[in-house]
């Protein structure tokens, strides 16, 4: 299935649904140079856990995931 990932740019990925969020972060890192540790992947505004698969998160074909930079604060 196709999945859209919006980080600094919009990317189209071909996935099976068995990939983990951590694998998507690694792919975004290779495309845009953003460290996976500095990424937050969002589905409809909710952050996704690294260990979860796309299928477990409810990601369907043609879904757009947002990738935001982690905010540092104290």
From Swiss-Prot:
Matches recorded under PROSITE patterns: UBIQUITIN_2
Family annotation (Pfam families): ubiquitin (PF00240)
Miscellaneous notes: This protein is synthesized with ribosomal S30 as its C-terminal extension.
Family as reported in the entry's similarity comment: Belongs to the ubiquitin family.
Protein task: Confers arsenite resistance.
Record's protein name: Ubiquitin-like protein FUBI
Annotated source species: Cricetulus griseus
Gene giving rise to this polypeptide: FAU
